[in-house]
Amino acid sequence: MADVVLGIETSCDETSAAVLVNGELASLVILSQDVHKVFGGVVPELASRAHLTALPRVVDRALAEAGLAPASIDAVAVTAGPGLAGALLVGVVYAKSFAYAGDRALIGVHHMEGHLFAPAVEDRQLAPPFVALLVSGGHTLLLDVPAWGHYRLLGQTRDDAAGEAFDKVATLLGLGYPGGPAIETLARAGDPGRFSFPRPMIADGFEFSFSGLKTAVLHAVRASPDLERDRASLARGFQDAVLDVLVTKLERAVVATGYTTAVLGGGVACSRALSGLAAQRLGARGGARVAVASPRLNADNAAMIARAGWYHLRLGERSDWTLDARADLPLPGLEMTVTTHPSLRSGQAPARRTDFS
């Protein structure tokens, strides 16, 4: 039984390690890479090199904060994809080496499944069925989750992810990277009625599109006679449009499924404006509960990877030594069971349980 799990996350620009003991978080270390800020976005080669340097120290610190020696680790869970290929490879190679050296179990985890499990790190009573909105720099996914390990894709973005749109609009407004926190801070001082931007596809099913909204902001920026005066209101108008679309789709999914719980996950879920609007509108619609993790668990982190890995390990699932990083690792869609990685040994999906609390 894998009671002590080391989680490793290196999919983008955070180097993270965490230790989970019997499902409880014992330690979490996240080292952010500040080197990218000057470029206004993540430089893949720099990210890979930074992970190479930082990961051994981050793992050592996570073990020390948990008060455990390496020999205490039963299993290693690592993000196998999707993400930046080089960055993922650093984590996967380290995890395989650590696991092999101690004859430990190894499990590859899908990054977005990690985000799905993030609220369960703090709320062990969280259990399906629920609707999940996972919003990050690379993904915008709306899922029907009838049980852990079973994910039905309701909708996703057709172009830019919501987090990507925030980063690009932040650049247009002369703000820093990452764009989401910068826009949210600036938007608090903006006039919500000054700029009204389109809500793309807001009336159309569960799909998303943010490219046209980004273009509308670009035109407004170019047309502004005083950008310094308008910057905060532009940020507010853009943020209001994105959040309105996200929450409207989430509301629609809750109604369609009849579920009483909605989960928010991913880096964009760090936004208090998003979680607040979702709680307000879903609460007004009959008391549906919104489950969202604390900001440090919504950002990329190893605790969520350890939690997802712990779930799969308790089902007897393992990855073999052919585990490899996949930048495009897919999250299976309608009626398909998400697997942690194609190298899982079991040829038949085991029965799923929902009571691992």
What is each stretch, according to the model?
Residues 1-345, 349-357:
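Acidic, glycine-enriched active-site microenvironments
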